[in-house]
């Protein structure tokens, strides 16, 4: 059963097991909380749709547990963005359609094998923030069959400081070949010294 409620400063939607709650924090700034059994690529899909709508992701924490995702996004509506209280975040996350991986630039990164979640890659990175950075990164990783099981995204003073725990779709550690391909993609995204 679908349920929805909307006020001047908040909106709530429930669709099946998925739900979203949006709260206006300040002029143009919103907190979006989402939960549900979303597909592996949902973060890539949602971030792509948000970038297409001129919505900047300021910071995020998302985590997958027991087949359910829980996430909190702090979003900034840029000029020509829609009213973020009226966006159907569940529909966007479940749409199954994402833009293709665009180019992105990293200033630095570190990729480590981790035992977290039964075997993941932990990626930490720093980059100049830009609209679509997260979308491009996640889309590039999805092309390698890598998806985050947990991520922390933070933007400070125009800089992105991100940490992601990556696994294959359905969980499980990436293969040595996937790790090598991931290093190639990340090395190719490093900014070149002037």
Stretches with model-predicted labels:
Residues 1-194:
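Regulatory modules associated with amino-acid/nitrogen control
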